[in-house]
Amino acid sequence: MQYLKPINVFSEIGRLKKVLLHRPGKELENLTPSIMKRLLFDDIPYLHVAIQEHDSFADTLRGNGVEVVYIEDLISETLSNDDSIKEQFISQFILEAGIRTENKTRALKDYFCNMSVNDMISNMIAGVTRDDLKNYKSDSLNSLVNSEYPLIIDPMPNILFTRDPFASIGHGLTINRMSTKTRHRETIFAEYIFKYHPIYKDNVPIWYNRDEDTTLEGGDELVLSRDVLAIGVSERTESESVEKVARKLFEQKISFNTILAFQIPQSRAYMHLDTVFTQIDHTTFTSFISDDMKFTIYALTYDVSSGSIKVKSEKAKLEDILGFYLGCKVNIIKCAGGDLIHGAREQWNDGANTLAIAPGEVIVYSRNHMTNKLLEEFGIKVYQIPSSELSRGRGGPRCMSMPLIREDI
């Protein structure tokens, strides 16, 4: 089936037809113990094995009829046919990497321009070391004081998690303002792809843009149905951003009539809403919550006559909230069945962060064996991928994928 729009995502579970990934690269080898916390990693993955695991992920997707595209290929295609756009991109990338001095900027421009577009993108993501710019010399105070720091531009290891920088909603998407400085550059790629790539330019409405002054991340955005969108108010996404997205969707008269803002704990274990729950079938969700935990949610609706957004606050159990707004009885499968020890461990390794490739079919990390067994007992078809290295980045299959096209349900 051919879709008239290049973006078509009206659910979390419609059969996945096209998805965006990033294959791990040298950026993981430029992580060091002294900078990994600042770059939001708890450990350093072994690149050779991480690539094998990620290729297994991509092969599983392809084996189920999903077209896999890579962000590095899309941005390379975007920049290959117009030198002026390429030059503009290089200048913006260098500026947003925090480079301010004229001689360092010139050296970096020369470095990036003297390689193919594909190599340039790979090296931008990998980061630029002092050894990469062997001909660059500076006797400025700043350079001398920081001479022992090996990187001129930090690597971008979090681009592995393509879900966060931008998120498909309906026929459009949000290009997000990331919460942490280290992830700001990731959204430059989205800006240029959706502005200049021949498939996407002039064809994709933008519901939220990276130049907004409040933060929003894709892991907090869940398309529950054609009518209902859930957004987490978390340590990474601010409440003002939810209102901005809601207003844009309501005013553009997209199908969504209710935006549910879920207030979740601001901690690394609950980094995004999709670490708390994900949808795996029409009425079934995975989650990491206690039986008595109640969520505070804010239901945003639109008053057409006044042009105002109405907000109603509620506090209830997750299954009651989802059941009411989806109009059905909801089943919640807890990580490791809610076991205090195994549940916490499997949540840490993204046991609740599943990727639905069709209703009742999910890709999961094999290491979360107790949760995976429960899924199978509920009749869910489970595709397990290896994850000893990928899991070190604290993101699961949903985090590592950005759906571009899903079948409508």
From Swiss-Prot:
GO terms for cellular component: cytoplasm. Keywords: Arginine metabolism, Cytoplasm, Hydrolase. It is found in: Cytoplasm. This is Arginine deiminase. Pathway: Amino-acid degradation; L-arginine degradation via ADI pathway; carbamoyl phosphate from L-arginine: step 1/2. Its EC number is 3.5.3.6. It catalyses: L-arginine + H2O = L-citrulline + NH4(+). InterPro entries: Arg_deiminase (IPR003876). Pfam families: ADI. Belongs to the arginine deiminase family. The keyword Hydrolase applies.
